[in-house]
Amino acid sequence: MIRILLIGQDHTTAERLGLQCLERGIGVVIAENVCEGVRVLATTPVSLIVADLSRLRLGAHDQAAIFDRAAPGVRVAVTIPTQSPIEARVALELAGFQVVSSPVTPDELLKPLA
C-alpha cells in the first residue's frame, strides 16, 4: 500500500490532500512538525514524505540528511509558495528534494512513484 506522510501542512490543505489520497486508495499519516514526522517514520513505513517549507528549520542539505537517516530511499517533496524565489527552489532541488508549488495535488506527488 502506498502511504504518504504529510508534515506541517495547514489543516485545510492536509484535509483536502488527505481526502483526495484516500479516494485513490493511498494511506495518509499527518504530523504537525518535522520532529513528530521523524517519530512517525520510526514506526510507520511510507512511500513519500511531503513537508511544508515553513516547517523545515535546517538548511536543505542538513534537512535532507535527517530524512535520509529516518527513511532511507524515501522521496521527499517540499511544498513552497508559488511566489518563492528561484534560489530557494534550486537549493532544495540540489539537496535532492522534489519541489512542488502550493497548493499541491496527489497527481503531482504520485507521478514519480508510478
Over which residues does each language-model region extend?
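Conserved active-site segment of CheY-like receiver
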Residues: Q9, T79-Q83, P103
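Two-component/phosphorelay signaling modules centered on CheY-like receiver
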Residues: D10-I30
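Acidic, metal-coordinating helix/loop segments flanking the phosphotransfer/catalytic sites
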Residues: E32-L48, L56
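Conserved phosphotransfer microenvironments
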Residues: S47-A70, I80-A88
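As written
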Residues: A91-V100
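C-terminal output helix
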Residues: V104-L113
